[in-house]
Amino acid sequence: MIPNNTQFSNPIFGRILTAMVTPFKENGGVDYELAIKLANHLCENGSDGIVLCGTTGESPTLSWDEQHNLFVAVKSSLNSRSKVIVGTGSNCTSEAIEATKKAYEFGADGALVVVPYYNKPPQEGLYNHFSSIATAASDLPLMLYNIPGRTGCNLLPTTVNKLMNFPNILSIKAASGRIEEVTELRAACGPKLFIYSGDDSLLLPMLSVGAVGVVSVASHIVGLQLKMMIESFQKGEFSIALDIHEKLQPLFKALFETTNPIPIKAALELTGWQVGSPRNPLTPLIKEKKDNLFQIIQNLSL
């Protein structure tokens, strides 16, 4: 069911969505039991919802069966207590359509659909790609995902504006690393587009120019602090929000010292969550960076 997107103060997916890691066992298989425990922990500690099988969830190295089983396990456990959004993007339009339709059939609350990567479509191709997905899964809310640093392709605000003619295209994860992206999207699309920061370090600046929340990595371990920062901003308590933002900056930086999700998996291990190493070709965090991360976590009393 597609909601009436008239209340900018009530974002469809909430304010804080955790882009959840995929836990692996020592034998390399997905640890579904631990995934359930982690998802519940996150939703009890600041997260309004979970994003599965995204960049942080290592979707490129998960089989379709693993992705399906992971979603079913987490969704069945959380039920309706929290939103579950599934990454269904692909650089093959037919694959993305099929994955998004399945997400709807299995009860997802939304789908995160990334800009096609590697083949670098022009804007017309991006419009055709997303409009085809929106038409095929017309009852499922979609979050566009613009991350040109990984895809090699930038989804322009003018194209997003055209795509908003589809009633299930309601939101975007803005991960270009540019604060101006929010301003440009607001200028092109107006206030009906729910814009989520794709970078923890840019959350507060992006809130100030119209973003509604964040698809977060850091919320794995500082979800309550992020929630407090957003609530403080909403109340006009800007000095409190800024103080939290500044205190968390070393952590935000450390979590992206190398390729995500390498650092966050190390951070989870350091805070008692044995989520396993990333799958090849990603590698565990090197000792020097892990020691630095440990010190930051200690300083934050996590």
From Swiss-Prot:
Enzyme Commission code? 4.3.3.7
- Provide the site residues for: Part of a proton relay during catalysis: T55, Y118
Name a single GO cellular component: cytosol
The record's annotation in SUPFAM superfamilies points to: Aldolase (SSF51569)
The record's subcellular locations are: Cytoplasm
Give the pathway annotation: Amino-acid biosynthesis; L-lysine biosynthesis via DAP pathway; (S)-tetrahydrodipicolinate from L-aspartate: step 3/4
Main location per UniProt? cytoplasm
InterPro entries, sorted: Aldolase_TIM (IPR013785), DapA (IPR005263), DapA-like (IPR002220), Schiff_base-form_aldolases_AS (IPR020625), Schiff_base-form_aldolases_CS (IPR020624)
Keyword annotations of the record: Amino-acid biosynthesis, Cytoplasm, Diaminopimelate biosynthesis, Lyase, Lysine biosynthesis, Schiff base
Enzyme class, spelled out: lyase
Q: Which GO terms describe its molecular function?
A: 4-hydroxy-tetrahydrodipicolinate synthase activity
Binding positions (pyruvate): T56, V215
GO annotation (BP), single: lysine biosynthetic process via diaminopimelate
Q: Where is the active site?
A: Y145 (proton donor/acceptor), K173 (schiff-base intermediate with substrate)
Q: Which reaction does it catalyse?
A: L-aspartate 4-semialdehyde + pyruvate = (2S,4S)-4-hydroxy-2,3,4,5-tetrahydrodipicolinate + H2O + H(+)
What's the stated role of this polypeptide? Catalyzes the condensation of (S)-aspartate-beta-semialdehyde [(S)-ASA] and pyruvate to 4-hydroxy-tetrahydrodipicolinate (HTPA).
HAMAP family (alphabetical): DapA
Q: How does it assemble?
A: Homotetramer; dimer of dimers.
State the family named in the UniProt similarity comment for this chain.
Belongs to the DapA family.
Q: Mind telling me what this protein is named?
A: 4-hydroxy-tetrahydrodipicolinate synthase
Q: What species is this protein from?
A: Prochlorococcus marinus (strain MIT 9515)
Q: Recall the taxonomic lineage recorded for the source organism.
A: Bacteria, Bacillati, Cyanobacteriota, Cyanophyceae, Synechococcales
**Which gene name does the record give?**
dapA
